[in-house]
């Protein structure tokens, strides 16, 4: 494998000195870019794009051609794992992801098998190895998965949900059934992420998009417990260097201390968290990623630059901060505004790394 030319992102996650704060954007390969829309049209639909390793590689690299980003993230979807378990993933216009066969009974959960990442998810591994080769050491490649709780919400609800009624009913009325599902998902995610590392991923991220829907105690029981199991089972060293792991619970600002206890290297912060407060609470244990409100990219460029300045000042001096948005970039953002955001992070952060 080619030697890394820019390892700023990996170094910041491991709290090693950097010359400036690294930056990337969640969903940086996405619908705000005209070139992404063209490639997606060529693929036919979203899942066909995910399953074609050459096109998945192309869209992963597109934002890196435009911007001086410090990391690439695999173009895929968190629902590849449940899809590989045989649930029949499809996308309904205006409705988002749906499953033909939800796992809303104990019998359905018992029948689930753990997918082989090199077989049922082989298309993802082919994308990882292709992207890693094409990056040629320019920046590190991030692999990722959804958290067991977040994947389970889609599997039990049969798709997206605003209320999480079915899965919460299972959590409180049939907890043994939900624990069985979460355990299978944790085992599946461990295999899936370790296979991504074996195929070239240099950092890992676990997206717990819906952990914030849980109560204080339920979060620990149904979400954090299974992310802990995953962290314990991950390959943390490959290609002669550490493979950092980042946990991100959207709406998880209450639980940063508990998340930092898992042994992960970094925590993702959404935009509701004060980064200065987060650093005071857990900065001695973990690096922090975040956390500008993605909607700020709709603001005039001087306002974006001002927000970047405030977040950098909030984190303060020294390493251990990866700048990002607090969630994925919105599809209607002007690509020039995204570019101004990235430039502002690099230009303004040098003063904090003397």
Swiss-Prot record:
Transmembrane segments: none annotated. The record marks 77 as: Transition state stabilizer. It catalyses: uroporphyrinogen III + 4 H(+) = coproporphyrinogen III + 4 CO2. It is found in: Cytoplasm. Its EC number is 4.1.1.37. Gene3D superfamilies: 3.20.20.210. Substrate binds at residues 27-31, 77, 154, 209, 327. Disulfide bonds: none annotated. Its main location: cytoplasm. Signal peptide: none annotated. One of its GO terms (cellular component) is cytosol. The keyword Cytoplasm applies. Pathway: Porphyrin-containing compound metabolism; protoporphyrin-IX biosynthesis; coproporphyrinogen-III from 5-aminolevulinate: step 4/4. CDD domains: URO-D. Keywords: Cytoplasm, Decarboxylase, Lyase, Porphyrin biosynthesis. Catalyzes the decarboxylation of four acetate groups of uroporphyrinogen-III to yield coproporphyrinogen-III. PANTHER family: METHYLTETRAHYDROFOLATE:HOMOCYSTEINE METHYLTRANSFERASE RELATED, UROPORPHYRINOGEN DECARBOXYLASE. NCBIfam families: hemE. Homodimer. Belongs to the uroporphyrinogen decarboxylase family. This is Uroporphyrinogen decarboxylase. The gene is hemE.
């Amino acid at each position: 494998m080619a030697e890394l030319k820019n390892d700023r992102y990996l170094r910041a996650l491991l709290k090693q000195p950097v010359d400036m704060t690294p930056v990337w954007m969640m969903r940086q390969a996405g619908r705000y870019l005209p070139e992404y829309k063209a490639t997606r049209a060529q693929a036919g639909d979203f899942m066909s794009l995910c399953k074609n390793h050459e096109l998945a590689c192309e869209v992963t690299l597109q934002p890196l051609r435009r911007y001086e980003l410090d990391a690439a993230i695999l173009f895929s979807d968190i629902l590849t794992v449940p899809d590989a378990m045989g649930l029949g993933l499809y996308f309904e216009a205006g409705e988002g992801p749906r499953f033909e066969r939800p796992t809303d009974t104990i019998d359905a959960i018992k029948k689930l098998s753990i997918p082989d990442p090199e077989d049922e998810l082989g298309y993802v591994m082919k994308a990882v190895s292709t992207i890693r080769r094409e990056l040629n050491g320019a920046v590190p490649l991030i692999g990722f998965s959804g958290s067991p709780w977040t994947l389970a919400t889609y599997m039990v609800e049969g798709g997206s949900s605003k209320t999480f009624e079915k899965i919460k009913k299972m959590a409180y009325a049939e907890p043994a059934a939900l624990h069985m599902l979460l355990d299978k998902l944790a085992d599946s995610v461990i295999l899936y992420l370790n296979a991504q590392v074996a195929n070239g991923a240099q950092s890992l991220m676990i997206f717990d998009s819906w952990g914030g829907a849980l109560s204080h105690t339920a979060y620990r029981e149904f979400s954090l417990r299974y992310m802990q199991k995953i962290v314990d089972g991950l390959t943390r060293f490959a290609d002669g260097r550490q493979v950092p792991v980042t946990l991100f619970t959207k709406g998880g600002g209450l639980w940063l201390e508990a998340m930092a206890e898992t042994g992960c290297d970094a925590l993702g912060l959404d935009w509701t968290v004060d980064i200065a407060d987060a650093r005071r609470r857990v900065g001695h244990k973990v690096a922090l990623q975040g956390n500008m409100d993605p909607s700020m990219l709709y603001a005039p460029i001087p306002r974006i630059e001002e927000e970047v300045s405030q977040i950098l000042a909030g984190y303060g001096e020294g390493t251990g901060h990866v700048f990002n948005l607090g969630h994925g970039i919105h599809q209607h953002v002007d690509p020039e505004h995204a570019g101004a955001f990235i430039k502002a992070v690099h230009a303004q952060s040098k003063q904090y790394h003397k």
